[in-house]
C-alpha cells in the first residue's frame, strides 16, 4: 500500500508538471486528468472517499470546461508537442525547482511525518470528511457566497472581453 500511495504522489507531481509545461492546451488536458485522478486516488487511500469523489467531479469538470474553452480559442494548425526542446527545458527547470525546494525545506530528513486517516476518532460518530463538508456550508457560507459572486463577475468580464467591438453574448436591447 505504501508503494501504491508513493506511486500516486509521483503521478500527481508529474501531472502537475505536465499541466505547467504544456506547449498547447490540447496536451494540458492529459496532465490535468492524470493529476486529478492521482490526487483523488491519494485522498481515497487516506479514507476520504466522499471528499475525493466531490473534488474529482467538481475540479475535473470545471477545469475541463476551461480547457475546452481555451482549445476552442487556440487555433494552432501545428501545435507544439511535449517532445520539443523548449518544452523539455521547461520540464527540467520545473524538476530542478522542485528538488531544490524539497532539499531546502528539509523534507528529505523527515520521512516519518505520520499519516492519519479521516475515520471517526473517539466519541465522534461522523467521519471527519463528512463533517468538514457540513462545516463548509454552515460556517463558510459567507466566503461561499463571495466566491460565487466573484465567479459570476468573472463570467461577465470574460463575456465582455470576448465580445470585442461587435455584438456578442451580452446585447443592449
UniProtKB/Swiss-Prot annotation:
Main location: mitochondrion
Catalytic activity as recorded in UniProt: a ubiquinone + NADH + 5 H(+)(in) = a ubiquinol + NAD(+) + 4 H(+)(out)
Membrane topology annotation: Multi-pass membrane protein
Enzyme Commission numbers on file: 7.1.1.2
Superkingdom in the source lineage: Eukaryota
GO cellular component, one term: mitochondrial membrane
One Pfam family recorded for the sequence: Oxidored_q3
Keyword match DNA damage: no
Record key words, sorted: Electron transport, Membrane, Mitochondrion, NAD, Respiratory chain, Translocase, Transmembrane, Transmembrane helix, Transport, Ubiquinone
InterPro entries associated with the record: ComplexI_Subunit6 (IPR050269), NADH_UbQ/plastoQ_OxRdtase_su6 (IPR001457), Nuo/plastoQ_OxRdtase_6_NuoJ (IPR042106)
Localization of this protein: Mitochondrion membrane
Transmembrane regions listed in the UniProt entry: 1-21, 27-47, 48-68, 87-107, 139-159
Keyword Zinc-finger: no
Similarity comment: family membership: Belongs to the complex I subunit 6 family.
Function: Core subunit of the mitochondrial membrane respiratory chain NADH dehydrogenase (Complex I) that is believed to belong to the minimal assembly required for catalysis. Complex I functions in the transfer of electrons from NADH to the respiratory chain. The immediate electron acceptor for the enzyme is believed to be ubiquinone.
Name of protein: NADH-ubiquinone oxidoreductase chain 6
Organism of provenance: Brachyramphus marmoratus
Gene assigned in the entry: MT-ND6
Amino acid at each position: 500500500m505504501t508503494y501504491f500511495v508513493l506511486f500516486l504522489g509521483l503521478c500527481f507531481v508529474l501531472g502537475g508538471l505536465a499541466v505547467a509545461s504544456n506547449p498547447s492546451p490540447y496536451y494540458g488536458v492529459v496532465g490535468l486528468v492524470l493529476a486529478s485522478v492521482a490526487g483523488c486516488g491519494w485522498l481515497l487511500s487516506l479514507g476520504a472517499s466522499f471528499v475525493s469523489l466531490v473534488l474529482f467531479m467538481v475540479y475535473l469538470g470545471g477545469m475541463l470546461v476551461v480547457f475546452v474553452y481555451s482549445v476552442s480559442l487556440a487555433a494552432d494548425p501545428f501545435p507544439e508537442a511535449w517532445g520539443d526542446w523548449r518544452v523539455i527545458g521547461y520540464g527540467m527547470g520545473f524538476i530542478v525547482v522542485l528538488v531544490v525546494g524539497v532539499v531546502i525545506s528539509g523534507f528529505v530528513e523527515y520521512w516519518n511525518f505520520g499519516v492519519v486517516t479521516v475515520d471517526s476518532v473517539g466519541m465522534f460518530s461522523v467521519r471527519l470528511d463528512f463533517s468538514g463538508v457540513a462545516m463548509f456550508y454552515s460556517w463558510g457560507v459567507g466566503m461561499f457566497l463571495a466566491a460565487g459572486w466573484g465567479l459570476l463577475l468573472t463570467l461577465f468580464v470574460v463575456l465582455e472581453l470576448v465580445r470585442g467591438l461587435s455584438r456578442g453574448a451580452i446585447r443592449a436591447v
